[in-house]
Amino acid sequence: MTYDETKAYLSQYYYAYQKVDSLKEELRCLEELANGTQGINYDEPVVQKSRSLKAPFIRYIDRIQKKEEELSQKVEELLNLKDEIHEAIATVNDPVMELVLTYRYINFWEWCDIASKLHYAESYVYKLHRKAISLVLIKEDSKRQ
């Protein structure tokens, strides 16, 4: 794989993580709607009609359940992807370069934080990263994107 393809493969976890985070936020909003109080609409004319005896949160329950199932599935996929990426990073066989890749692609650290943690100059961390990317071996069946 090329340098850019390997970086894209390792970056998949970040985007999957963001998707899970987004689903959690959607679920939180739905739960907030279900648990919130309903307002009165004064714009419509008052018409005598039969009142619904269903609780107002009932209409959100199905949506919440579907979103929870989707979230559960995405979390499972996220954990599997994380394991795959850990395996790929482990193929580098150099502890410092593995740390650079782990900090960057699993922990989502900024370059300056990685350099500070490892007590290296940021430019040297870039050099280690470039070399580590070239050493990563990705299984054929793992090459999804």
Give the label of every model feature segment.
Residues 1-91, 138-145:
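N-terminal interaction/assembly modules
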Residues 81-84, 95-97, 128:
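N-terminal positioning helix adjacent to the helix-turn-helix/winged-helix DNA-binding module
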Residues 85, 125-136:
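DNA major-groove recognition helices of helix-turn-helix
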Residues 89, 93-96, 124:
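Short coil/turn residues that cap or connect secondary-structure elements
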Residues 93-107:
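Short amphipathic alpha helix immediately N-terminal
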Residues 113-116:
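Short alpha-helical "recognition helix" segments of helix-turn-helix
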Residues 119-120:
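The short coil/loop that forms the "turn" connecting the two helices of the helix-turn-helix
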